[in-house]
Structures are given as structure tokens and as C-alpha cells.
Amino acid sequence: MSALARVLVVDDSPTMRGLISAVLKADPEVEVVGQAGNAMEARAAIKQLNPDVVTLDIEMPEMNGLEFLEKIMRLRPMPVIMVSSLTHRGADASLAALEIGAFDCVGKPAPGDARPFGDLADKVKAAARSQHAAYRATRPETAAAPQPVPMSEYRAGRKVVAIGSSTGGVEALIAVLQKFPANCPPTVITQHMPPTFTKSFAERLNRICAPVVEEATDGARLQTGKIYLAPGGERHLQIANRSAPCCRLLDRDPVNGHRPSVDVLFDSVAELAGRNAVGVILTGMGRDGAAGLLKMRHAGARTVGQNEKTCVVYGMPRVAYELGAVEQQLPLASIGEEILKLTTARKEGAD
């Protein structure tokens, strides 16, 4: 990567190309090296300009963004940030893009949005620095989905699992949760996502994982065999009620620039569950969740961080590790099984 993050903006709308370019040019560490209005123009521009990162509209005429993304990942793997409408259809397409290999997704702004595209410039810089392209290029295209541990081989103890993730988290969560049996420990997750995206993601996880996965609702009781995903962009997820633990959705300002925030979730788990918890921090940029994971460890919880080699962005796990919050760092493929080891009931009774 050069000193500046060099980005190509691809969108069929001249207005949207101009807006994205203006947002990116406002950051002195980002250089917009070109624009393209369709896949053919984009392919030529990538060959000519060799950008570090591409922003790509999902909904384009002729060859759409998903089709073009597949070609990029097959022929020239590189970090691509998808730009999508904040609709259910847009969310489904964004999730498909992330599974194909997109670095991240951002939503198109609503009229009057004070911060159009949010932290897009930061995402572009993180993408340019990341190992994402190299990781994608070396991953087998036909890798089989992880198989869940059979229910007969796992007996849940009394522990609750809390997981936090951001950039790269969609693929990481799929890899972890597909190892879980249908009788997995109650699991609460905060993944940084735009509004509407988490509902689609929960539905997707529910189809491909053995446990029940749902978007968290206020007051939902934590149950064995259920996974609860914080709704994107609206409220923070906590756990509450020591005698009958449940989800609590909290109206509060963003924490660490995020709502929902991983720190808010981890803080509540540290206070409520103490040593009867496992905290996991996965790939993501920034530091959200690091301080909360440290609180969990100090409260007696077991803690796991994703290692640098398998992270799309080694940000949140790095800060957590440097703070002393991470008991053990593991490659992504080992984390699901490790969570199950840490939460299984002891032979003499639930721990």
C-alpha cells in the first residue's frame, strides 16, 4: 500500500459517485484515483489505475455488483466495499456480497443524513492496510461448511457466551456458529451492522446453523439452543435479570462510535454472569469491546480473541490482547470448538 489509500469509486449514478468521492476526498489519507459507471468501465480502471480498494454499488445495470464482485474475487482478489440501499433486499444482497468476499458494506444515506456514508473513509483505509485480499486468495473456493458438534457429544453448563465483531464479522460468525450444536449455550452477539441488515443476517444464520438464531428483542429470555443478535444501528444489547437472564435493548448514545456497542454488551455480561461466561472478540477495526472483555476477564470469565493471521482487520482483537483482556488467541477455525469446551457441563454437574 502507498502512503495514501487509493480508491476507485464504482456506481451507475453520477450523483452518488460524486457524493462518495467528496466524502472520501475530505480525508487527507485517502486518494480517489478514478470513477466508473459500470462493470466494464470498472474493469478497465482497475487494470489501468491499480487501486488499493474499490467501492462498488450493488445495484447496477448490465452486470450487477454481485456478479462483478465474483469476477474480482476469482481473477484479482482485492478489498471491495459494497454500497447498498438500506432495504431488506439490499441487506440480503450485502450479506451475499460479504460471503463472496467483500471487505465490508455501507448503506446509502437517507436525505438530510448528517454523516453520509458514516465511517466509509476509515473503512477504506482499513481495507487498504488489511491482509484481506491475500487471505481470500489463499482460501479454498470449495471449502466445506464447518459441521456442528453432535448434540449427544455436548452438554451445556450454566455459562452464557458473548461475542463481539465488526469488519469481517459476517464470515467469522458463520464459521464459529456453524460448529455449535442445537443445544448450544445461550449466546448473545453484537456485530456492527447498519439498520435492517441484522434481521437478514439472523435469518441467514438461522437457516445454516443448528441452533435457533434470532434478532434480539427486549425481554427475550436467554435459553439453551438459542443465539441472539443485537439489532443494527438502533439500540444497545445488554443482558439483565440475574435470576432469569434476558436480553435488554437500551436507548443510549453510541459508545466508541457504535450503536450497538460490543463494550455495552460485555460490561453487562461481566456484571451479571461473572465467571459463568465466555467472552469472544472477533475481527473488526477500532477498539470496541476491548475494555468490556477486560472487565469480563477480571470478573472471572474465560476470554478468547481471534488471532491476527485469520482476521480481516486485526483491530478490536489486537487492542483487547494488548490490554490483557484475551486469555488465549486462536485461529478462527478453532474458536467454535474452544467455546464449546469452555462451556460444557462438568461430569459431576454443571459448572
UniProtKB/Swiss-Prot annotation:
Task: Return the broad EC class.
Answer: hydrolase
Pfam families reported for this sequence: CheB_methylest (PF01339), Response_reg (PF00072)
- Active site (UniProt): S166, H192, D288
GO BP terms: chemotaxis
A single Gene Ontology MF term assigned here is: protein-glutamate methylesterase activity
Cell compartment(s), UniProt = Cytoplasm
Response regulatory domain span: 6-123
List, alphabetically, the GO terms of the cellular component aspect: cytoplasm
Residue intervals of the CheB-type methylesterase domain: 154-346
**EC number from the UniProt entry:** 3.1.1.61, 3.5.1.44
Q: Which UniProt keywords apply?
A: Chemotaxis, Cytoplasm, Hydrolase, Phosphoprotein
**PTM comment:** Phosphorylated by CheA. Phosphorylation of the N-terminal regulatory domain activates the methylesterase activity.
**Superkingdom of the source species:** Bacteria
Catalytic activity line of the entry: [protein]-L-glutamate 5-O-methyl ester + H2O = L-glutamyl-[protein] + methanol + H(+); L-glutaminyl-[protein] + H2O = L-glutamyl-[protein] + NH4(+)
Q: Which residues carry this modification: 4-aspartylphosphate?
A: D57
Per its UniProt record, what PROSITE patterns does this chain match?
CHEB (PS50122), RESPONSE_REGULATORY (PS50110)
Q: What is known of its domains?
A: Contains a C-terminal catalytic domain, and an N-terminal region which modulates catalytic activity.
So what does this one do? Involved in chemotaxis. Part of a chemotaxis signal transduction system that modulates chemotaxis in response to various stimuli. Catalyzes the demethylation of specific methylglutamate residues introduced into the chemoreceptors (methyl-accepting chemotaxis proteins or MCP) by CheR. Also mediates the irreversible deamidation of specific glutamine residues to glutamic acid.
Question: What's this protein's family per the entry?
Answer: Belongs to the CheB family.
Protein name, per record = Protein-glutamate methylesterase/protein-glutamine glutaminase
Q: What is the lineage of its organism?
A: Bacteria, Pseudomonadati, Pseudomonadota, Alphaproteobacteria, Hyphomicrobiales
